[in-house]
Design a protein with these regions (language model features):
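Rossmann-like S-adenosyl-L-methionine
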Residues: 152-210
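Class I Rossmann-like S-adenosyl-L-methionine
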Residues: 1-178
Length: 210
């Protein structure tokens, strides 16, 4: 059903936006505070977070859509007075997307935590692992071999608008998708597992019902 598919896509988008803003708050505040001096209302900052996150980290979202939706959001929560400010700040961020090399700002990690890590592990080690800190691990849909192989599972998932890639006896899917809502999951065609658990089971030659 097209309507349900659209709803699921909206839910996935909103979920990615909420988690993304939470993870990248330090980076977002750097850009917002660069153009706004002094305190701003929490609702206004939230609208700016949402717009700035889309501009900086969601390449598929057009700038105009990110800015317009944030302005509309502010109006919907009674912040019409600040709509022009939000519009102006987001346009400035859109024209100035370069994230500085400062480790705290670049990776959205509190400065005191970075200082502690550097003291414990050294600056080179910290710089090496920080790029991975915000990476989202992929999901592994393990095919239930009673019913399907990985290629057949991929086909079933694609029928639910899920994009993935088939390997051995599993399908790798980018995170941010609710696989439990798919018809394939409800029909028991696969189960969800992280890579470490999967590798442990393979190493132990785990059999069904073990």
């Amino acid at each position: 059903d097209k309507a349900l598919s659209a709803i699921d896509k909206d839910k996935a988008f909103i979920s990615a936006l909420v988690y993304g803003v939470t993870e990248r708050k330090i980076t977002l505040d750097y850009f917002i505070d660069k153009y706004i001096k002094g305190k701003i209302k929490p609702k206004v900052r939230i609208a700016l977070w949402i717009g700035a996150y889309q501009l900086l980290f969601m390449e598929k979202v057009p700038s105009s859509a990110a800015i317009n939706e944030s302005v509309n959001l502010a109006k919907q929560v009674g912040q019409d007075y600040y709509s022009k400010l939000i519009n102006a700040v987001l346009h400035k961020i859109d024209n100035d997307r370069k994230i500085p090399d400062d480790l705290s700002v670049k990776y959205s990690v509190p400065q005191n935590l970075i200082n502690m890590w550097i003291k414990q592990y050294g600056e080179d080690e910290v710089k090496a692992f920080l790029p991975c800190i915000n990476d989202k691990p992929p999901l592994f849909a393990i095919a239930n071999k009673k019913f399907v192989n990985s290629d057949e599972l991929l086909y079933e998932l694609e029928c639910s608008n899920v994009v993935g890639e088939a390997y051995d006896d599993f399908v790798i899917i980018e995170n941010g998708v609710d696989l439990t809502k798919t018809k394939a999951f409800k029909n028991g065609l696969f189960y969800i597992e992280d890579l470490s658990s999967y590798n442990c089971a393979k190493a132990l030659n785990a059999k069904e019902n073990d």
